[in-house]
């Protein structure tokens, strides 16, 4: 059972801080005027890592809750961003670059799903 233990709060806070910081750095380094590469990168990397973490956590039920909370709820929650993706897509639509908006939305959704599957498959292959 998950509790409101101080360690759980700390784990989420530290993980979220690190994930949000990495997303900010990716945005600074990679986002351009025409295509938000930083946000896409954060979401694709986050998709892969959530697949990895889901598979690892499933294969290690003995791990304490704070590990999952730090990695998944904290770090990956801070790294990935559906709200920024949505705002960037709507901005593209408002600017009339419909093909770019559709490509970005498609790449973000399909790419994140594919990366999550790849993360799961990677761990399952390595644990054989």
From Swiss-Prot:
It catalyses: fluoride(in) = fluoride(out). Na(+) is not transported, but it plays an essential structural role and its presence is essential for fluoride channel function. It is found in: Cell inner membrane. It holds the Pfam family CRCB. It comes from the Bacteria. GO terms for cellular component: plasma membrane. It is a multi-pass membrane protein. Coiled coil: none annotated. InterPro entries: FluC. Na(+) binds at residues 77, 80. One of its GO terms (biological process) is cellular detoxification of fluoride. One of its GO terms (molecular function) is metal ion binding. Keywords: Cell inner membrane, Cell membrane, Ion channel, Ion transport, Membrane, Metal-binding, Sodium, Transmembrane, Transmembrane helix, Transport. The chain crosses the membrane at residues 2-22, 37-57, 65-85, 101-121. HAMAP family: FluC (MF_00454). Fluoride-specific ion channel. Important for reducing fluoride concentration in the cell, thus reducing its toxicity. Belongs to the fluoride channel Fluc/FEX (TC 1.A.43) family. This is Fluoride-specific ion channel FluC. It comes from Bordetella bronchiseptica (strain ATCC BAA-588 / NCTC 13252 / RB50) (Alcaligenes bronchisepticus). The gene is fluC.
């Amino acid at each position: 059972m998950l509790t409101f233990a101080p360690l759980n709060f700390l784990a989420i806070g530290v993980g979220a801080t690190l994930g949000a910081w990495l997303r900010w750095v990716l945005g600074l380094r990679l986002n351009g005027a025409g295509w938000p590469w930083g946000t896409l990168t954060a979401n694709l990397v986050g998709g892969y890592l959530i697949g990895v973490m889901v598979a690892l956590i499933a294969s290690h039920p003995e791990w304490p809750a704070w590990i999952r909370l730090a990695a998944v709820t904290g770090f990956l929650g801070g790294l990935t961003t559906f709200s920024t993706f949505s705002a960037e897509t709507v901005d593209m639509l408002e600017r009339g670059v419909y093909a770019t908006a559709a490509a970005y939305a498609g790449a973000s959704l399909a790419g994140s799903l594919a990366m999550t599957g790849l993360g799961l498959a990677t761990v399952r292959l390595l644990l054989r």
